């Protein structure tokens, strides 16, 4: 349960931070967190790593500086860490979720922010990563942010996350081919998906080897 996850995080938090962490070490920590989250369910295997890859490809296409791309890639690896607080019976459910189950799934975004905000090296990423289910039309969660409140970095992670969620196999359906995925995403450009990030995604995907 989420309170147990939070208790564990707080218990591990030192009284003072005296260790200087280099970028390579932070990359490794973020990747390890992502692997732990992804191993929670067979349907999320590799998800965080793929979202990080697509995030970096979009960021590169948009011309973000290398150091900013590296920072943002960590945010993508960590975006679903809050799912450690959501029951597998909900995450792996093949049918439609009821209201209580859907609320439990939505809570993972707030858990992500709570967990990352307690880790000094990742505190700056807490809001950026946790907001990946916010929408430009204000109908997202956990805060219902409007377009002007959603950073470019979050918009990039959101675009990458949606792309992987559709192209990956789910409990209730098989994987959807990339052309069909892009068609489905295009219907949500301007409401859930940033148009600039979507165009960058398409350009990035076109550059990938077949």
What is the predicted function of each stretch?
Residues 1-210:
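Metal-dependent catalytic cores of enzymes that make or break cyclic nucleotides
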